[in-house]
Amino acid sequence: MRTILLAFICMMALGSSQAQNQKAERMKLIRSTYAEAKKKVEANGKNGQSPKDMQLVINRLEDEDIPLYDTELLDFYFEEKIVDGLVTKQPPYLIVERWGNHGHLRYREVLIDPNNHKVMFCYMRGETDGGFVVESRYYYDAEGQCIEQKHNTENSWTAPETELENAEYYLKLFNLVNYNGYFTPLDLDKPKKATTPKAERLKHIRALYAKAKEKSAANDRAEMSDDLHITIHDLGDDQPPRTTATRIYFDNEGIYFISRTSKSMMMEGYDEFLFEPKTKDLIFSYTRAAEEGQVYEWRYYYDENGDCIETKTTNTDETDDGFYDKRAAKDLQAIFDLLNGHEE
């Protein structure tokens, strides 16, 4: 009996020793991966290399009567690989969040394993307007289980599970932005609505467009704006760097206008999306593309069912009745909804 007990104790000790060794190896890997990620961020866009990063900035006036202004910045750092002959974005290797509201501050880092794209480490630092600081660090194994956590105070604001949820939220945002036009399906089976005569509909769209342009311009001049900026620097080092800048304008009812600019040494592009205030349906889209001295334009006007009722273009050989624009607009709305916590 004593021999069996001794054997059991030895097995338990051996298992504990192996677990400790595995944890030590994992912690060592996390720290080396973190150091490498920081080096990549520091070198991003330097030494003749194309920058590869994405930033989301959302500005919100929380209350018109009380000046509580909310600003959130999300930086995603990624790499690109050639997959089947195409330059393909990889999931980000590091995500950084900066948030501020009326003196309250928050800073986050999420480290992603560059091999299996799973979360390895999360860091959060929060500070109140009174100067109270909370710091938390979470280390995860390959299965996503927290193997160690460190806090500077007993009253932690976060937990291993909530930080993983935040990381998944950030990754979903990254995918929505970078696969814009291919992610959110269109609802093609919804019941048909009654439509207004074409001439009346076009007049309505043009009037709303003029109002949206005026409103977005006023927002740009405002000290406290309500808008979302998305800036992406990408393309591989064998191609000219490209910058895509998207501005989503919104009010208490939701999105009313979006503009998007894309620039590289080879081409320039510009898009606009106009939404119906009551239903938030896309009612007009515009695209302008300039390449090698040639300029192409497309304008699509939509009825109450999202069907294109008028197309104006300088390139009649390439038109799709706004199908891609509708999908792109749907994804941009999904990004906004996800950021505001009311996704479908």
Segments predicted by a language model, with ranges:
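Short, hydrophobic/aromatic-rich segments at coil-to-beta transitions
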Residues: 55, 88-96, 117-123, 226-231, ...
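Gly/Pro-enriched, hydrophobic low-complexity segments
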Residues: 108-113, 120, 124-129, 138, ...
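Long terminal segments
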Residues: 20-73, 131-240, 294-344
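Sec-dependent N-terminal signal peptides
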Residues: 3-15
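Short, surface-exposed coil-to-beta transition loops
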Residues: 92, 103-108, 122, 131-136, ...
